[in-house]
Amino acid sequence: MKYGIIKVKRAFLYEENGVDVVDEVFFGWSVMWEDEGEWIEVWTHYGYRGWMERNLIEEKSREWMEEREKAGNTYVVTRGFADVMRGARVQSRMLETLGRGCFVEKMEETENGYCRVKLANGISGFVPEVALRKRLDSDRFLWGKSEERFFVEQGIPEGWSEEKFRRKVVECAKGYLGCQYRWGGKAADGIDCSGVVFMVYLMNGVLIWRDADIREGYPMKAIWREGEEMCLVEERAKAGDLLFWRGHVGMYLGDGRYLHCTGHERVFGCRVNSLRRGDEDFREDLAEATPTRRSHSMIFTAARA
């Protein structure tokens, strides 16, 4: 097995035919693969598969990957966009622009509210410290011994509490409001329904399945069954839980409201809607396509109890 990191700002994963987009990865994200070629099938650090161009990956040894994990100086861009500057001042030359979700190596040098970072392509420059957060998720799936159980047994981030986690994921999700819809996307300039909830959970240290369904082996469980009344959602769901329809997913915010990214022709983006019939922003079409599952994010906690 070979290992590497993405060395461009963004790269799309495709179906084997190289035409249909299935996912998006960013600077510094880890992948592994077996067979070489112009196009290769990769496994991501969150267990998803897809095909991408080999020249977008910087090959690394497994030892390098493990050492990066242990070092703990990988940070993630939390702002929609963040410029990498040659110097630690706003007037300096811009070297690169990073999007939310990009991983960088944070160096010790800091100045004027900036910190020096190193990118996966070797570029080094300064980024505002407020645009970064210490990475909380893990690459260990790529070399783990228990692949089937890794995601339900992934470690709890330091200082974790259910109340804090729920508050953080809701706050993070709202950062995508107004973002346009893009099939397979996970970026602040284009994202799909499952991309939003995946990124929100990743930014807060939990890796979930990337698509709009509940996949065995990942930290989600159903707390609502098909055929039950919609009114039961508010009784059982808490802020930060995920709401699943067939082929669609959103995040419950509380008070009968949910955030989702939709390709519907009248919206085509990320917005908030109501579950309550009679509200101005109630989605009749989603009400008719009754959600098949209600997913309780906190199985992540139960799995560690």
Regions found by a protein language model. Give the residues of each.
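Short, flexible active-site loops
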Residues: 153-155, 174-185
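Charged, glycine/proline-rich intrinsically disordered loops and linkers
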Residues: 141-156, 160, 220-230, 280, ...
